[in-house]
Amino acid sequence: MLNLLYNQIFNVILNDVPTPYNTYFQDSATPNQEGILELHDNIMFYLLVILGLVSWLLFTITRTYSKNPIAYKYIKHGQTIEIIWTIFPAVILLIIAFPSFILLYLCDEVISPAMTIKAIGLQWYWKYEYSDFINDSGETVEFESYVIPEDLLEDGQLRLLDTDTSVVVPVDTHIRFVVTAADVIHDFAIPSLGIKVDAAPGRLNQVSALIQREGVFYGQCSELCGTAHSAMPIKIEAVSLPAFLEWLNEQ
């Protein structure tokens, strides 16, 4: 009991999976997702300020009008207030827009990737290729990843999220994901990593990730792609570099 209490107080339990009634983001594991969280929190501050100001104005005007309906009957222009309600929203939009564009372009940058993983969406599973590595047969390391049926789930496994094979990657390594599809449009999305990129047939899209901690991160296809769209989970295991090399030798 004391050990459980100690762990709850002093150990940080990170949320890397969807949880019931959760109204916020999953915990970030990459700089991109940290930037998204910071941008969201900053924008929410300005939205709350605007909400408070508009609510106060609405309440004040309604109360004043109810007391004296003809108080401003002969006022046709209010140059000062017109200048304020034109400039103030423009300034707010600029304050929001600049960080948004900076983050948008930073997320699109692929900085000297140490390894490339190709993710191919198919109805209704994912196929992965480690293009930089060749096995003993002289072929690139590749495998398919299917959702584990509900009746085969073991204790601790997640419904519609766990897969029979995982994408294993090393931490603190610049990784490039090249995403495409072989049939219809899919979407490769992992919330904790700040990744969401379309997988379109005949088109290669790329996104980078620098995973900063070990863990298991889940995602799903985020583009309606057919009857089994919900059965296209993504499971990424971030491990230490020695553990990754050991896994690679087994392939």
UniProtKB/Swiss-Prot annotation:
Entry PTM: The signal sequence of COX2 is processed by IMP1.
EC number from the UniProt entry: 7.1.1.9
Topology in the lipid bilayer: Multi-pass membrane protein
Family membership: Belongs to the cytochrome c oxidase subunit 2 family.
Binding annotation for Cu cation A1: 186, 221, 225, 232
GO annotation terms (biological process): ATP synthesis coupled electron transport
Annotated CDD domains: CcO_II_C (cd13912)
Binding site for Cu cation A2: 221, 223, 225, 229
Top EC class of this enzyme: translocase
Residues annotated for Mg(2+) binding in this entry: 223
Assembly, per entry: Component of the cytochrome c oxidase (complex IV, CIV), a multisubunit enzyme composed of a catalytic core of 3 subunits and several supernumerary subunits. The complex exists as a monomer or a dimer and forms supercomplexes (SCs) in the inner mitochondrial membrane with ubiquinol-cytochrome c oxidoreductase (cytochrome b-c1 complex, complex III, CIII).
Keyword list, A-Z: Copper, Electron transport, Magnesium, Membrane, Metal-binding, Mitochondrion, Mitochondrion inner membrane, Respiratory chain, Signal, Translocase, Transmembrane, Transmembrane helix, Transport
Protein's cellular compartments: Mitochondrion inner membrane
Database matches in InterPro entries: CcO_II, CcO_II-like_C, CcO_II_C, Copper_CuA, Cupredoxin, Cyt_c_oxidase_su2, Cyt_c_oxidase_su2_TM_dom, Cyt_c_oxidase_su2_TM_sf
Residues annotated as transmembrane: 42-62, 83-103
Residues annotated as signal peptide: 1-15
Protein name: Cytochrome c oxidase subunit 2
Cofactor(s) this protein requires: Cu cation
Keyword Magnesium attributed: yes
Reactions catalysed, as given in the entry: 4 Fe(II)-[cytochrome c] + O2 + 8 H(+)(in) = 4 Fe(III)-[cytochrome c] + 2 H2O + 4 H(+)(out)
Cellular component GO terms, alphabetical: mitochondrial inner membrane
Pfam families from the UniProt entry: COX2, COX2_TM
SUPFAM superfamilies: Cupredoxins, Cytochrome c oxidase subunit II-like, transmembrane region
Function (record text): Component of the cytochrome c oxidase, the last enzyme in the mitochondrial electron transport chain which drives oxidative phosphorylation. The respiratory chain contains 3 multisubunit complexes succinate dehydrogenase (complex II, CII), ubiquinol-cytochrome c oxidoreductase (cytochrome b-c1 complex, complex III, CIII) and cytochrome c oxidase (complex IV, CIV), that cooperate to transfer electrons derived from NADH and succinate to molecular oxygen, creating an electrochemical gradient over the inner membrane that drives transmembrane transport and the ATP synthase.
